[in-house]
Amino acid sequence: GFSIGVLLIKDEPTQQNTDKLDLTTTSAMRWLLDKAANVEEAITMLENMDMHASANASHHFQMADAQGNSAVIEYIDNELRVIRKEPDGLQYLTNFLISEDVYGFGKGQDRYEILENTLTQNHGILSEMESMDLLQAVSQDKISEDTGKQTATQWSVVYNNTKKTAKI
């Protein structure tokens, strides 16, 4: 099993322009879900395509597979970056960049800290219900102080890559 999630970053949209396959954020996710069996295959596929961000923003992705591999994909200045999970480590993500040279750009550091604390305390092992409760605890549904616009989590899903199930 393989799963992928996407999170919005308020930044210039990624627009790669080479001679590779052109895909948007959502079509790339669909392509990866249809064709990639694991994280390494997905990374190879992304390296061989040009990303064109949807929603006039930038995005980063977190992907995982049934073998316990996980990676975050970020596009910085239209260049693909891969941040792999450390062996025996945990990986989690909110709406700010985690690439070392731009770490912290964006929002959601408070929600990231909740993820970090909860997952660390539980050694990364949560039931489906506990996982959904954690996603609810870090979801957004508020009016932005910066723009006056509503900021909301669009969906939350708990994936079990071993059983190949998803809980909404």
Question: What is the predicted role of each segment?
Answer:
Residues 5-34, 57-59, 64-168:
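C-terminal, well-structured catalytic/ligand-binding subdomain of enzymes
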Residues 33-36, 41-51:
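Short N-terminal edge-element motif at the start of the domain
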Residues 1-3:
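Beta-strand-turn-beta hairpins that frame and shape the catalytic cleft
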